[in-house]
């Protein structure tokens, strides 16, 4: 984790409670001194997740407007969907995670279900 102080990490959050968990992780890592960015490719649906996102924005955590670069040497935290996923996953998002996993530039850690994996299969 010490290398992440220099290279940073990106928390990719989803529209529901799993995304809120990701925002909390981003907050806690930021408060411990890590370089943290957050990217949310969805419209947030859950009130609590909206509140968490608002709070981390007020702390000065970088909110990315575009997808993170898979070639950068940073850790990605996948907080997109949880066990109760009911919607299909965007194929562009799956491809982005696949690109990252093929590089030797950082890692992906999923806090629940890895993006692209069907929780019902």
Stretches with model-predicted labels:
Residues 5-121:
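Glycine-rich phosphate/dinucleotide-binding loop and adjoining beta-alpha-beta core of small-molecule
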Residues 1-3:
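Conserved alpha-helix/loop element of class I SAM-dependent methyltransferases that forms part
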């Amino acid at each position: 984790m010490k290398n992440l102080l220099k290279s940073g990490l990106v928390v990719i959050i989803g529209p529901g409670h799993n995304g809120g968990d990701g925002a909390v992780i981003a907050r806690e890592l930021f408060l411990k001194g890590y370089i943290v960015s957050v990217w949310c490719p969805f419209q947030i649906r859950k009130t609590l997740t909206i509140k968490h996102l608002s709070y981390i924005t007020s702390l000065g955590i970088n909110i990315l407007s575009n997808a993170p670069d898979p070639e950068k040497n940073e850790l990605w935290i996948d907080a997109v969907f949880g066990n109760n996923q009911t919607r299909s996953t965007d194929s562009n998002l799956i491809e982005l995670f696949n690109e990252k996993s093929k590089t030797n530039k950082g890692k992906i850690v999923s806090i629940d279900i890895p993006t692209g994996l069907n929780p019902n299969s």
